[in-house]
Amino acid sequence: MPEFPPPIDPSYVPSVSLTRIPANAPIEDILAVLERDGGLILTDIISSQDVAAINDELDPYVQKARAESHAAYDLIPKQTIMVPGIVGKSPTMAKIAEYEVIDKLRTMVLQKKCTATWEDRTEEFTIGPLLNSSLTYNVSYGGPRQRLHRDDMIHGIYHHDGEYSLSNETMLGFMFAGCKTTRENGATMAIPGSHKWNHTRVPRTDEVCFAEMEPGSAFVFLGTVYHGAGHNSVPDQVRKVYGLFFISGTLRPEENQFLAIPRSKVLGMSDKMLSLLGYKKPETWLGIVNNGDPAENLKEVLDMANS
């Protein structure tokens, strides 16, 4: 990939902004804004105590990581330290992944309700979401901005003109602020409404706004929204963001959850998390082992896999 693009001119004033909604607002109100704009900021979704706990739990991994240790991501600059698989490293992040508002949003957006036609009958079934990846983004001073992009490009998703339907979305992301995020220290750029664009429309930097947040808030966005990390121009300041990204259960996760999360940790996880990681089969036969649901006797299945 070519060199990273130059920073956005500091004199640029956005003509749009991201709607801010309390995390305890009615789920229908949150979903309506998400469908309209493609992204929003949920305020106060994580307590200050949990923000501190996440920072403490992940700091040892951040200290051991190298800024350039993300070879698979050529869109991430060297000034960014990424720690992968954080639901297996931070018990607090694993707990947050099961928050009611997060669970409801990912289910309402990503759960697929399907009908199968047989010779003599039809059957209805659902396929729940999966965890796509869980990561830290620690962006140091001088980190350049990313190119504007859509996250769903990893699955080769194409977008066509016509009536928009939220049911066609395949990805939903939550980026939690581990510190105060500002335009100056690299707050995520986003283009509200771009989730309804066709595949050929090219995003412009004069269409972006910035996901500026207080610690504990989250930028929630669809995989169809054009966005990108901003440029950190503040000396001695690191922008800390923690990401949880979910996909439809019919797609292959970006992060291989069977290898990213230690199996010793998996055995102690909830049924909800086992489903998100892909260890528990949905109502179809996806993910079976030995002709059955691996979650029914997970220790035995993992012992077999380790033999």
Curated annotation (Swiss-Prot):
Q: Which Pfam families match?
A: PhyH
Residue ranges the record marks as coiled coil:
none
Q: What is its EC number?
A: 1.14.11.-
- Matching SUPFAM superfamilies: Clavaminate synthase-like (SSF51197)
Q: In which pathway does it act?
A: Mycotoxin biosynthesis
Question: At the top level of its lineage, which domain of life is listed?
Answer: Eukaryota
The protein's required cofactor(s) are namely: Fe cation
One GO MF annotation is: metal ion binding
InterPro entries in alphabetical order: Phytyl_CoA_dOase-like
Keywords attached to this Swiss-Prot or TrEMBL record, sorted alphabetically, are: Dioxygenase, Iron, Metal-binding, Oxidoreductase
Q: Which residues bind Fe cation?
A: 149, 151, 227
Q: Which PANTHER family has this protein been placed in?
A: PHYTANOYL-COA DIOXYGENASE DOMAIN CONTAINING 1, PHYTANOYL-COA DIOXYGENASE FAMILY PROTEIN
What is known about what this protein does? Dioxygenase; part of the gene cluster that mediates the biosynthesis of swainsonine (SW), a cytotoxic fungal alkaloid and a potential cancer therapy drug. Swainsonine production occurs via a multibranched pathway and is dispensable for fungal colonization of plants and infection of insect hosts. The first step of swainsonine biosynthesis is the production of the precursor pipecolic acid (PA) via conversion of L-lysine (Lys) to 1-piperideine-6-carboxylate (P6C) by the aminotransferase swnA, the latter being further reduced to PA by the reductase swnR.
State the family it belongs to.
Answer: Belongs to the PhyH family.
Q: How does it assemble?
A: Homodimer.
Q: What is this protein called?
A: Dioxygenase swnH1
What is the name of the gene encoding this protein?
A: swnH1
